[in-house]
Amino acid sequence: MSQSTPTSISAKELHSWLNNQSKQPICVDVREEQELALAALPWKVLHLPLSQSSSWMGTLSQSLPINQPIVVICHAGIRSFNFGTWLLEQNMGYQVWNLEGGIDAWSVEVDPSIPRY
């Protein structure tokens, strides 16, 4: 059965994934530029701000490989959930997770050096 909504992943689970060489996800950050300036993640992410979707929509399939888990991130987990759901609706075979609570949860549960906003 195919996935219809993103699977939730906690900040602690994602931290574990990022430290496990065998399960390296592609992290897609859908926050806006000004949000990245406030709180940047300490690892490589694919930045796809939702307000600029017209600029990256046509190349999305080249940016996201089918064979790697995709974790979508935003501030609180709502925009990322919506984007992850849309991504799954494209029926391209992606495996999509949503960071529960977004970067705010990451700051609270994993890395307090990431500013909360």
Question: Language-model segments: what does each one mean?
Answer:
Residues 1-25, 33-69, 78-117:
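Rhodanese-like catalytic fold shared by cysteine-dependent sulfurtransferases
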Residues 73:
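Short, surface-exposed ligand- or partner-binding patches at beta-edge/loop junctions that are enriched
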